[in-house]
């Protein structure tokens, strides 16, 4: 399916209760409900994919990986949660794409963009000496006789992913980057980066670990319970409390 179709899909968005009914059917083995959930959430997946473009990967490949994250979120979503499905799904989709990129090794940046990035770096050094200050993007573009947007694109493409994704929790050197949430101007509104960071920073260490294991490591509540030495019921209760706390703080921030 063409990327533009995914990006500009005009399917009417489902209401939250409709989404949850489809999730219930899907979790009970209804393949049609599962397929419809994918179809209706293409825009959601594509919005996440846009965060990872210009990394040397085909958008279609990233979209397919994102759909795997979407399906995992369908399978793992607890219907007793008082939270929108999209709020739960976005971190899962992000995590799936990040794992794909991490497991694939060094992020592949196209050779032409790499070469342009090197030219920009040299031009920046030369202009800094000449001007006695850091040159603007437009000055670099004029110097190289290219468009300013090409300068921005090349710099973004060769930048290390670790400098783009801000770490909000780290466990044994493995960072959680839930701040890779995306802003959206439609009625489906997701976590704001700064507010989310503040909400997570207010959690207790055990609560942060639960967020990390559940939303970044994709562990089940039973696996988290075993890791923490508590029951699955306790994990479920704590997770609901955490989501409610974050939701309240996010709502307060939005207000």
Swiss-Prot record:
Residues annotated as transmembrane: none
CDD domains for the chain: Sigma70_r4 (cd06171)
Top-rank lineage group of the source organism: Bacteria
Motif (Polymerase core binding): 61-74
Outcome of swapping residue 237 to K: In spo-560; 1000-fold decrease in spore production, 50% induction of sporulation-associated enzymes
PANTHER family listed in its UniProt record: RNA POLYMERASE SIGMA FACTOR RPO (PTHR30603), RNA POLYMERASE SIGMA-F FACTOR (PTHR30603:SF19)
Physiological role: Sigma factors are initiation factors that promote the attachment of RNA polymerase to specific initiation sites and are then released. This sigma factor is responsible for the expression of sporulation specific genes. Interaction with SpoIIAB inhibits sigma-F activity throughout the cell before the formation of the asymmetric septum; after septation the interaction is confined to the mother cell, and sigma F activity is released in the prespore. Responsible for expression of csfB (the anti-sigma-G factor Gin). Associates with the RNAP core only in stationary phase cells.
Protein name per UniProt: RNA polymerase sigma-F factor
Organism: Bacillus subtilis (strain 168)
Gene this chain is encoded by: sigF
């Amino acid at each position: 399916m063409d990327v533009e179709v995914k990006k500009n899909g005009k399917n009417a968005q489902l209401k939250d209760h409709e989404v949850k009914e489809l999730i219930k059917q899907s979790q009970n083995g209804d393949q049609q409900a599962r397929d419809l959930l994918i179809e209706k959430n293409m825009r959601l997946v594509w919005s996440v994919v846009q965060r990872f473009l210009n990394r040397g990967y085909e958008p279609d490949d990233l979209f397919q990986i994102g759909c795997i994250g979407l399906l995992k979120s369908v399978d793992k979503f607890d219907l007793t949660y008082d939270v929108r499905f999209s709020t739960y799904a976005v971190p899962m989709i992000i995590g799936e794409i990040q794992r794909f990129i991490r497991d694939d090794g060094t992020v592949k940046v196209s050779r032409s963009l790499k070469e342009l990035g090197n030219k920009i770096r040299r031009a920046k050094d030369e202009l800094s000496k000449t001007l006695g200050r850091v040159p603007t993007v437009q000055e670099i573009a004029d110097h190289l006789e290219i468009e300013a947007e090409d300068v921005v694109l090349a710099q973004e493409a060769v930048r290390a992913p670790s400098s783009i994704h801000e770490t909000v929790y780290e466990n044994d050197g493995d960072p959680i980057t839930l701040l890779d949430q995306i802003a959206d101007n439609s009625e489906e509104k997701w976590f704001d980066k700064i507010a989310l960071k503040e909400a997570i920073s207010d959690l207790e260490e055990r609560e942060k670990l639960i967020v990390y294991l559940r939303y970044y490591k994709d562990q089940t509540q039973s696996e988290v319970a075993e890791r923490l030495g508590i029951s699955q019921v306790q994990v479920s209760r704590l997770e609901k409390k955490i989501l409610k706390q974050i939701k309240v703080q996010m709502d307060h921030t939005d207000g």
